[in-house]
UniProtKB/Swiss-Prot annotation:
Induction: By Cu(+) and Cu(2+).
Reported function: Acts as a copper chaperone by delivering 2 Cu(+) ions to CopY Zn(2+)-bound form. This transfer results in displacement of zinc and dissociation of CopY from the promoter, allowing transcription of the copYZAB operon.
Extra remark beyond the main annotation: Controlled by copper-induced proteolysis.
Gene source species: Enterococcus hirae (strain ATCC 9790 / DSM 20160 / JCM 8729 / LMG 6399 / NBRC 3181 / NCIMB 6459 / NCDO 1258 / NCTC 12367 / WDCM 00089 / R)
SUPFAM superfamilies: HMA, heavy metal-associated domain
Protein name in UniProt: Copper chaperone CopZ
CDD domains: HMA
Subunit structure: Monomer in the absence of copper. Homodimer or homooligomer in the presence of copper ions. Interacts with the copper ATPase CopA. Interacts with CopY via a charge-based interaction.
GO cellular component: cytoplasm
GO terms for MF: copper ion binding
Xref: Gene3D superfamilies: 3.30.70.100
């Protein structure tokens, strides 16, 4: 599945790298691309292994505000 997430609170490329690294480590995530200027993340993942809510939670735990769009 491919899902877009709104991500608020990012200010630089380091923020992008932190999110991509953290989400990329989640079992079932195949690809993650974070876009700083658009304040969003696009994640491809296997729904059998992970849910969109878990991805949001991982981003939120880093101190950003994520939600499914």
């Amino acid at each position: 599945m491919k899902q877009e997430f709104s991500v608020k609170g990012m200010s630089c490329n380091h923020c992008v790298a932190r999110i991509e690294e953290a989400v990329g480590r989640i079992s079932g995530v195949k690809k993650v691309k974070v876009q700083l200027k658009k304040e969003k993340a696009v994640v491809k993942f296997d729904e059998a292994n992970v849910q969109a809510t878990e991805i949001c939670q991982a981003i939120n735990e880093l101190g950003y505000q994520a939600e499914v769009i």
